[in-house]
Amino acid sequence: MPTNWHSVVLENKEYLSFASNDYLSLANDKRIIKAAKIALDKHGYSTSSSALISGYTASHHKLEEEISEFLGQEKTLLFSTGYQANLGVIKALVSRDDNIIADQLNHASLIDGSILSRANFKRYNHNDYKDLEKIVLKCKTKNNLIISDSLFSMDGDIANIKKLSIKARKHKSSLLIDEAHSLG
């Protein structure tokens, strides 16, 4: 039974929980709880359909704009889950004749998105950018997408985004970094 999202109590002993995604401890933040209650009173619990059908609201649009401003980006697109985001984004970026070169320890959603995209899918040894470069050099087609987590959720390793960016530019490849476990 959770005492908070960062620990669990089993047989009267408290243990650290590694199953939480509440990295910033916002789940029990009083300000967020208050804002959520106000939003529930104003908008109800559900839009009763997905954004694709009729569930996209002015609040969703406002959130996208605020995230874009925070990140200094032109646009933001909300997805219901990180898993869906990875599937949707990867499929939008590659076609069947393209190459995906991905870190071996990427999150399952990145692996599934890569496989489901039907692009040529290759994996390089974890955080081994020389291996990445060897694989890119063997790719026959021009359009390559390099994919990596920034923070690997299962072991806490951090990708070297600067090196990945340099390799991507050098080989005229696109780069997709999943920030789900770092930025959130």
Task: List PLM regions with ranges.
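Substrate-binding/gating loop at the entrance of the active-site cleft, primarily
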Residues: T81, I101-S117
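Short, small-residue-enriched loops and turns at beta-alpha junctions
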Residues: S25-L26, I53-Y56, A108, L151-D155, ...
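Active-site phosphate-binding strand-loop segment of PLP-dependent enzymes
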Residues: K122, H126-I177
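Conserved N-terminal alpha-helix of the aminotransferase class I/II PLP-enzyme fold
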Residues: K34, I38-T81
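Conserved PLP-anchoring active-site segment centered on the Schiff-base-forming lysine
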Residues: V89-A108, Y129
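N-terminal "arm"/small-domain region of PLP-dependent enzymes with the aminotransferase-like
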Residues: M1-Y45, S173
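Short, structured coil segments at secondary-structure junctions
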Residues: R96, S117-R118, H171
